[in-house]
Amino acid sequence: MRRGLQVELINLNDIVLKYFFTPRDKYLPFEEVWQDALRAKIEEFQPDFIGISCMFTMTHQSLARVTDLSRQISRRPVCIGGVHVTNDVKRVMEDVPADMAFIYEGDLSFLRFIEVVEGKRPASELSQVVIRDDGELLRFDNRLVPSPDDISLMPAFELVADLSAYTQHGSIGAFSQFKREKARLATVLANRGCRAQCTFCSVRTFNGVGVRGKAIGVVVDEIAYLKEHYEIEHIMWLDDDLFYDERHTIHLFNELTRRNLGVTWDASNGVIAAACKEEVLAAAAASGCTGLIIGMESGNPKILREVKKPGTVKHFMRAAELLRRHPQIYSCVFLMLGFPGETLSMMYDTLNVAREMDLDWYKIAILQPLPSTPIYDQMVAEGLIEDVGFLEVRLELGAFGKQNELYRQPLLASRSFKEIFANLDPNAVPSRRDVDNIWVYMDYHLNYHRLFSLTDSIKIQLQKRMLENIYNVTSAGHPLALYFRGYFARLENDPVLAEILYERLKKSLDSSEYWRDKFPAFNVSPQHLRDNVFPNFKVPRIRAGSLPVDELLVGC
């Protein structure tokens, strides 16, 4: 009750995960689990006001169902908010039976709303809220952006039920597999906003222009509090621009090192390549960094300019060179295909730059324009997409969302990749079907085939963890991950594990027509794990600076 308001939280996601992770003789249906929990909380607390937050478009239907049930249980006003709501608030309000929606950051605007309700301010001073009134939507757009002082507060962790147990049920981020075994994980935010203006990103829409940093002492005290009270040993930074302000960043990491908290961390949301200076990365490594992602998206200079990326190919190469000096940091790169007007040769540029960077993993996505972003408006204006808002958005959530989506697609034509590329015009924009093939080719060669040439013992151990996380967690039964983990098992003279992986791989292929089609195209087979013979071992990696059609693509 810091401001005289009594607040209680309920995390429906954690309740559902905890329920189904707990062994029991009989399980209730999914819907009953969260509905019973929500009903019990509302009836016990009897709130004057119910707020529901939704970050991801893919959970829109959950937002709608939770809102609807809340209205059935209580006659009190129900409001919604979060990134998803902000990005397309009019359409969301048309589909979700909420009384109002708070848009953008609600730290100050919600308190302003309370003051208006209490009669301390006139209604004309309402900010960042959309109110349903007799079938109409009244929108108050005045922006109240929290200052660095406003956000330099310790979160009210006491409102979160059993924070220390969260890691037992599910995972978060791209690098949880690299934390110490059984280490508990939490999230922390040091900065809000991003200096970049990437046209495909909604961060600037939500947070506004620029970056606001929390006081370093407050951030480190928060991490120390999590360690002391909840035994948290790994944090994932939620920042969209963690390396903003070089001196501030180095000071933050040095303070973490000085305090010797014994906490590791990762940056799953990506960092700006131009900000990856040696002193920053050295301080990051010393303070416990286990993994980070560079936001590259494209290796073509024209595309980079058009989407307003804050970096050049030179920046990407330099950042990769510096990261290779810190092998304990698992370094990934965000790549994206399918930008407006992006030709096949431009996609080759991305492939070639990524290959030359030679980092640990490449998270490849196909562009999905989000409402309220410049690229969405551009594509609508050019007739490339229809203005249907979130209704057609299919977020590729997590590091392997694209893979999971492809596996559900109709079977692609069974052709070798050499044939596919030979029949494409390098100066033409590929069809969506061809982009899918290009994606699969890039994923195999940038992430998997290169493992044949890996010799560094530190990197081999990290890649084994990555592969295990893929086929056990992020993309269950992923055939390529199983195949290459089997290769490492054979490399380490572990035929028992190789046989186990062989059986799992056979089962995965039996259930996936898609992968039964693609495995021969890559010249890989489960039998290789049994025979300890891997024909592609002798196939050279893609050379930087050359097009795939020019490569020695034996079986590919």
Predicted regions, residues:
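Acidic, low-complexity intrinsically disordered segments
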Residues: M1-E222, K227-E231, Q463, R485, ...
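Structural recognition of alpha->loop->beta junctions
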Residues: R91-S109, A283-G291, D349-I364
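A short acidic, helix-capping loop that chelates divalent metal ions and anchors anionic groups
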Residues: K18-Y19, P301-E306, P374
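Radical SAM [4Fe-4S] cluster-binding motif and immediate context
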Residues: F157-L337, T343-M346, N352
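Conserved beta-strand positions
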Residues: I52, I80, W237-D239, I294, ...
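Short, solvent-exposed turn/loop segments enriched in Gly/Ser/Thr/Pro and often Arg
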Residues: N13, H84, D240-D245, G270, ...
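C-terminal accessory regions of radical SAM enzymes
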Residues: K18, V130-D133, L137-L144, Y330, ...
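A structural preference for short, hydrophobic beta-strand core positions in alpha/beta folds
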Residues: L9-N11, I80, A267, V333, ...
